[in-house]
């Protein structure tokens, strides 16, 4: 599962396009994150989406913050996801658990049921994060009632741009293929290196300790 997570995060890189408005840049980030989240949910792995989607959403918030002039740490981005996610997630965890159970019984069908919901949830979190940073810039409050309203409107609008089931499943297969290909390549490289090291093992007397290039403390 870790190779798949790394592949997902590697595929979600974003540079702010100065030719676009902040709103347009944010739209690209949110849609990309939501599509990747839906693809993860389409994977026939029980509860995989619960484990993989949070790191993706954290990276989404990092990107949105950067677009609005905020350089925040991953730890702070995670806190924002948890804070805003609490507003969005009433009942979501229970539904995700039930969908995880569905994947145990009917892996492919369970994944296809989950993908649209996770897409909408991630899209709503992205939109709520966007308003969160906009309010930070202007110094306006953004309490729970306002967060809930923004999230509800975003969930509704996400249905109009929802990708097809084949879009989710095709991307999921491609991510899985790349992750497996990369893992296989790394295993082969490690095996070749180990074989080379065993053939040319240095004599103990020739090994000298190197001083660190910078202080370790």
PLM feature spans:
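Terminal, membrane-proximal amphipathic helices
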Residues: 1-40, 56-80, 84, 88, ...
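A generic, lipid-embedded transmembrane alpha helix
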Residues: 87-98
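Short hydrophobic membrane-inserting alpha-helices and related fusion/pore-forming segments
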Residues: 38-52, 96-118
């Amino acid at each position: 599962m870790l190779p798949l997570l790394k592949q997902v995060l590697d595929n979600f890189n974003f540079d702010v396009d100065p030719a676009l408005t902040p709103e347009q840049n944010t739209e690209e980030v949110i849609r990309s994150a939501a599509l990747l989240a839906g693809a993860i949910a389409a994977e026939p792995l029980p509860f995989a989406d619960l484990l993989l989607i949070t790191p993706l959403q954290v990276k989404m918030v990092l990107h949105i913050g950067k677009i609005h002039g905020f350089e925040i740490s991953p730890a702070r981005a995670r806190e924002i996801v948890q804070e805003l996610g609490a507003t969005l997630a009433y009942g979501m965890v229970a539904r995700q658990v039930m969908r995880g159970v569905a994947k145990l019984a009917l892996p492919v069908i369970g994944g296809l049921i989950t993908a649209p919901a996770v897409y909408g949830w991630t899209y709503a979190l992205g939109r709520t994060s966007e308003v969160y940073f906009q309010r930070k810039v202007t110094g306006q409050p953004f309490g729970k009632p306002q967060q809930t309203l923004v999230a509800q409107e975003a969930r509704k609008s996400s249905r109009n741009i929802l990708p097809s089931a084949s879009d989710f499943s095709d991307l999921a297969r491609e991510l899985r293929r790349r992750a497996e290909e990369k893992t296989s390549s790394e295993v082969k490289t490690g095996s070749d290196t180990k074989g080379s090291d065993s053939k040319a093992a240095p004599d103990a007397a020739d090994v000298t300790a190197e001083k660190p290039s910078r202080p370790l403390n």
